[in-house]
Amino acid sequence: MTLNIILLGPPGAGKGTQASRLEDEHGMVQLSTGDMLRAAVKAGTPIGLQAKAVMDAGELVSDAIVSGLIGERLDELGPDVSVIFDGYPRTAAQADALDGILSARGRTLDHVIELVVDEDALVDRITGRFSCARCGEGYHDRYKLPKVADICDVCGSKEFKRRPDDNEDTVRTRMVEYRAKTAPILPIYEARGIVTRVDGMAPIDRVNDAIETILGTAG
C-alpha cells in the first residue's frame, strides 16, 4: 500500500525523529522542499536551474518551481514509494497544487498528522538540551544528565555544547510562526476528515506507535 502523508509539528516536536523512523522501518521517503531544492540546484536539473536563476537574483522561489520540484522527485521515486511531505504545503494555493501533482501521478493524500505540543513543556524540552561536542550524544538538564557529571557516557569527552537558538524567545517565536503557517491549510484537510492529532510530548516510542496505528502499518 502506497501512502502519501503530511507530517506537521513545530520545531522540537519530534517530527524529524518520527519521519526518520518511518523511512527506516517502512521505506518511506521524506520530501523536504528545502532539501529537494538544494539537490536539484546541485544536480543541475531543469527545475534546479530555474530555481538557481531565481535565487541568484535574490528573489523567492515561486510555487510553480516548488511544485515542479515535487513532481520531479515523485517521478524519480516511481508510483510504489510512500512519501512524507515536510514543510509543504504552507498555503491554500500550495495545498491545491499538491492535489494536482498527486492526482496526475495516480496518488491521493491519505493522512495529515499533526504532532501537538504544550508550548511551556516544549520550551523546557528544548532549552534544557545539550550534546557531547565530540560524538553528538544528546543530554538534558532535567531528564538525561551524564551518569558521571560532566563526562559523556558514550565517548568519555568532557566537552559539551548547546545550540545557540535553543532559548525561550526563539522557541516561542517559532511556535507563533508555525501556527501562522499551518492555519491556512489545516481547515482544508480537516474538511476532508484526514487530519489526526498525536501528542508530540509523549515518549518517542509511544508517538511512533500512534502514527503506525493511524497509517495502518503497526505490526
From Swiss-Prot:
Gene3D superfamilies: P-loop containing nucleotide triphosphate hydrolases. It is an enzyme of class 2 (transferase). It is found in: Cytoplasm. One of its GO terms (molecular function) is zinc ion binding. Its EC number is 2.7.4.3. Its main location: cytoplasm. One of its GO terms (cellular component) is cytoplasm. The keyword Aminoacyl-tRNA synthetase does not apply. AMP binds at T33, R38, E59, L60, V61, G87, Y88, P89, R90, Q94, R162, R174. InterPro entries: Adenyl_kin_sub, Adenylat/UMP-CMP_kin, Adenylat_kinase_CS, Adenylate_kinase_lid-dom, P-loop_NTPase. It catalyses: AMP + ATP = 2 ADP. Zn(2+) binds at C132, C135, C152, C155. Residues 32-61 are annotated as: NMP. Residues 128-165 are annotated as: LID. It comes from the Bacteria. ATP binds at G12, A13, G14, K15, G16, T17, R129, A202. Belongs to the adenylate kinase family. Monomer. Catalyzes the reversible transfer of the terminal phosphate group between ATP and AMP. Plays an important role in cellular energy homeostasis and in adenine nucleotide metabolism. NCBIfam families: adk, PRK00279.1-3, PRK14527.1, PRK14532.1. Consists of three domains, a large central CORE domain and two small peripheral domains, NMPbind and LID, which undergo movements during catalysis. The LID domain closes over the site of phosphoryl transfer upon ATP binding. Assembling and dissambling the active center during each catalytic cycle provides an effective means to prevent ATP hydrolysis. Some bacteria have evolved a zinc-coordinating structure that stabilizes the LID domain. This is Adenylate kinase. It comes from Sphingopyxis alaskensis (strain DSM 13593 / LMG 18877 / RB2256) (Sphingomonas alaskensis).
